[in-house]
């Protein structure tokens, strides 16, 4: 878990981060990526003079990321800060290879299918909980029903008072991740003005794209009341697009029909989409340098000549 060391890593020159998640489900990916995205954004905001995001747009989450809620065997910084376990913690999960989960409560007493607990956390029907029994074996059970401080199970278990209990499956959290859990939007600014018989709308985005669309409008009537909020709302109806209105300069003292604003907005969004595609710089693969010399004339097992194809490449370059 490198989340607490991101600032030091960026200071050391790291600009690309890879999150391990082989064979993990979509919930794991959503949770962990979102957690690190927020952690990176905090570092970038703290040092805005040094760092900028490599991408544009901001994702709005429908959940609060928490690493402890995804598969883990507890956490360690590994060898990132020192060569021995920090704070006396082991670098391996010796008690169980399964996910330990988050500490959530302690058992007050247990009888039959009922366990009374002491906790400040909310537990829901369907949550998966685990514990170590008195023999050190890792055990688990599913909560069938919650009745105040009592957990009602589907079958009796033997668990001693004072036993710490962990949550390995948070049903409410998993439900939040199962649907659309994030929406990414690019912030845009809008400016509305009238000149020489033309009503104009300018949209500009975070990447510096700027477009203007106009409609013929010989004159505008004075408004009987402030039209600013209504005009801003009409321009900000961007559902179904990648955009989100951040700021708008409008003409609150003039009356502009909603249908005119709607058509102007639609035309402007289409033009901004086109500008996005035209100005996007796609990295191109460089042409192969056929006469590039191999790094060594004589190769060894350490150079990883894995098969006949890699052998052909090395030989073609002089090895």
Label each region the model flagged:
Residues 1-319:
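Surface-exposed amphipathic alpha-helical tracts and adjacent flexible/coil segments at the periphery
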């Amino acid at each position: 878990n490198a989340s607490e060391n991101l600032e030091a890593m960026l200071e050391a020159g790291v600009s690309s981060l890879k999150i391990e998640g082989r064979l993990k489900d979509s919930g794991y990916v959503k949770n962990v990526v979102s957690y690190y995205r927020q952690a990176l954004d905090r570092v970038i905001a703290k040092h805005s003079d040094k760092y900028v995001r490599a991408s544009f747009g901001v994702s709005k989450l429908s959940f609060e990321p928490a690493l402890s809620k995804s598969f883990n065997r507890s956490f360690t910084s590994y060898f990132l800060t020192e060569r021995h376990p920090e704070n006396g913690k082991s670098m391996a999960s010796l008690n169980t290879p399964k996910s330990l989960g988050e500490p959530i409560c302690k058992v007050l007493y247990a009888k039959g299918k009922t366990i009374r607990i002491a906790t400040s956390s909310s537990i829901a029907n369907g949550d998966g909980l685990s514990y170590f029994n008195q023999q050190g074996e890792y055990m688990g059970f599913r909560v069938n029903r919650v009745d105040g401080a009592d957990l009602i199970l589907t079958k009796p278990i033997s668990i001693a008072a004072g036993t710490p209990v962990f949550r390995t499956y948070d049903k409410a959290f998993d439900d939040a991740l199962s649907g659309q859990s994030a929406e990414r939007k690019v912030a845009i600014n809008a400016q509305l003005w009238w000149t020489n018989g033309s009503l104009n709308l300018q949209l500009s985005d975070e990447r510096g794209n700027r477009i203007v669309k106009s409609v013929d409008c010989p004159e505008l009537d004075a408004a009987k009341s402030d039209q600013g909020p209504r005009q801003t709302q009409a321009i900000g109806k961007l559902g179904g697009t990648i955009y989100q209105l951040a700021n708008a300069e409008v003409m609150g003292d003039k009356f502009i029909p909603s249908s005119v604003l709607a058509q102007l907005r639609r035309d402007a969004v289409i033009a901004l989409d086109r500008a996005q595609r035209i100005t996007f710089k796609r990295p191109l693969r460089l042409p192969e340098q056929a006469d590039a010399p191999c790094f060594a004339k004589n190769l060894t097992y350490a150079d990883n000549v894995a098969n006949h194809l890699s052998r052909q490449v090395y030989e073609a370059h002089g090895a």
